[in-house]
Structure formats: C-alpha cells, structure tokens
C-alpha cells in the first residue's frame, strides 16, 4: 500500500491507528458514521477529502478492524486476484452461505412468505433439496478492493464487475 489511512469518527481509535502507523488525516463526521450509514458515504467523503489535499488514489481497499483473523497473505492473495482482472471494478470477500436464503422466510402478521420466491423446475426453493439449489455466497466484509473512480462517479463501492474473493477458514470471521 502507498498509504494506510484510518477512517474513523473516534479520537480514541484515531490514536490507536496512529500508534500502529496509520494516518488519520481527519475524523469522519457523525452524519456518515452512524451504525446504519452506508459505506459509500464515508468512502466517497474520504476520497474527496484526500483529493482536496492533493492526494488521489486509483485504487483503495477497505480492511475492517472487526476481521482480526485476516492475514497479510489474505490481502496479498486478494491483491493478486484483483491485478489479474484489470477490467474489474472491485473485489469483495465472500464466503459460502451456511444457511441457503432459498430456505428463509419473512413473517408478516400471522403468515410467512419465502424470502426468495424462486423455483427449481417448478419446485419452490424452500421445498427443494439443498443439493439442487445454486451455491450462494455472502459478503463477509473482511476485505474490499475497488477503483476510486467507481466510488466517486457511480455512488457504489462495488461497481458492476465484481471479483469474488472466497475467504478461507477464519479469514472472514467478523467479531
């Protein structure tokens, strides 16, 4: 990495990040730091703040502190995979779902409805054998790599061409 920048609204976390060698050029505002704030809000904000300070990056990565079992080799594997696909907009860490969403339900009042009303040869997914359902992956939020212009121009971190990075073992475990 050219730079390691911590994006936080916490002075305590900023001090910890600085202690371990990260830059904290500014603190995030509370408006983009709420529990339900979309990531794109703070990502676009920090990229624009850096541009205003004369620092621009073609590519950025999000490494969340809540993934403590992600290793340097994990990041190296992901970077290699991203570099091998120059037309991709981003790379996102995923893991195979342990519970298939085709077997999930939404409860409304005294009734429930399938979350995903898909069928497999006219059999609803919720009534199909697991082996007959497509493999489904869930993002584990441990690692993302993306092109800066995608975040700044399309209001999305992922873009449309996304490389799956399948986490191994506890790499994607979120605490």
What spans do the regions from the language model cover?
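Short, high-confidence coil segments that cap the C-terminus of an alpha-helix
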Residues: 1, 55-57, 85-88
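Short phosphate-binding loop-to-helix
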Residues: 5, 11-61, 69-80
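Conserved core of the sugar-phosphate nucleotidyltransferase
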Residues: 41, 68-160
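Conserved active-site beta-strand element of glycosyltransferases/polysaccharide synthases
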Residues: 163-166, 173-174
